Amino acid sequence: MKALVKEKAEPGLWLMDVPEPEIGPGDVLIKVLRTGICGTDLHIRSWDGWAQQAVRTPLVLGHEFVGEVVETGRDVVDIKAGDRVSGEGHLVCGKCRNCQAGRRHLCRATVGLGVGRDGAFAEYVALPAANVWVHRVPVDLDVAAIFDPFGNAVHTALSFPLVGEDVLITGAGPIGLMAAAVARHAGARNVMITDVSEERLELARKIGVSLALNVADTTIADGQRALGLREGFDIGLEMSGRPEAMRDMIANMTHGGRIAMLGLPSQEFPVDWARIVTSMITIKGIYGREMFETWYAMSVLLEGGLDLAPVITGRYGYRDYEAAFADAASGRGGKVILDWTL
């Protein structure tokens, strides 16, 4: 089968012929239809410091996908050939304290699809049945391909009650944009999103945010005033991983404000802990998706009319992967999709 492979410990990817994956008794073999390109894939392609520490070559990349089941192991009883499916990209041990308590997203031994084991940038991918999400109602293929990052957005945005709240989102990348759509759909009063990319801020305006603010020339405090806020934001969703974004968010929260932090900083950085303490601000780290409550929430949101179409801005056949990755790395658009049927 064809697959995008990190063949060598150096920058680049290689489209290669590799053996089709074999499945065990509890596994599912899936014919991949479409995949989404994630920031993680960009890191592995560029072979930065994180990738050099996390990845062992050769490796098939990719963890965002939608496909069709073609074969199931003998112990799989609730998934059948022909099912349209996506996959939870975090494979957990099932034995630790958190796994046994049903908190699988907190497993200390998590292995990432397309990072710690061969992934979905291929014509076929194999997964444990416990990681397979069957789409019981029709979902657009492009949207189904990005259920993994959509889940990150949903997990972050729904960490705290949103109805009637004023929400600040720092970072208008694809996950930030999806979080903004979720916040609006879930009943937030105001949703302000910040970035330095006018192209991405324009996407945010199409989603329907209250204010899309370019922090290269306007402060968050100015945005507050434009929205008529007197005491700061109730909810903060930090999606950028930028130190200055987190510091500005803390400075613009109301007393008792709550922050969900998905953005992953590249290094340690100082924050105003005195402000956090005296303003009684709650900060919650977010990683991945709750299994499978977040997946249920995603399906319900889409059934309820949530529109993610503006977030998907690039579509390519898998053989045009170089152009697709360049598009995804440009920082100017939303999600980029690879079609494995072309």
From Swiss-Prot:
It is an enzyme of class 1 (oxidoreductase). NAD(+) binds at residues 175, 195, 200, 262-264, 286-287. It is found in: Cytoplasm. The record marks 148 as: Important for catalytic activity for the proton relay mechanism but does not participate directly in the coordination of zinc atom. InterPro entries: ADH-like_C, ADH-like_N, ADH_Zn_CS, GroES-like_sf, L-Threonine_3-DHase, NAD(P)-bd_dom_sf, Zn_alcohol_dh. Homotetramer. Its cofactor is Zn(2+). This is L-threonine 3-dehydrogenase. Binds 2 Zn(2+) ions per subunit. Its EC number is 1.1.1.103. GO terms for cellular component: cytoplasm. Catalyzes the NAD(+)-dependent oxidation of L-threonine to 2-amino-3-ketobutyrate. Zn(2+) 2 binds at residues 93, 96, 99, 107.
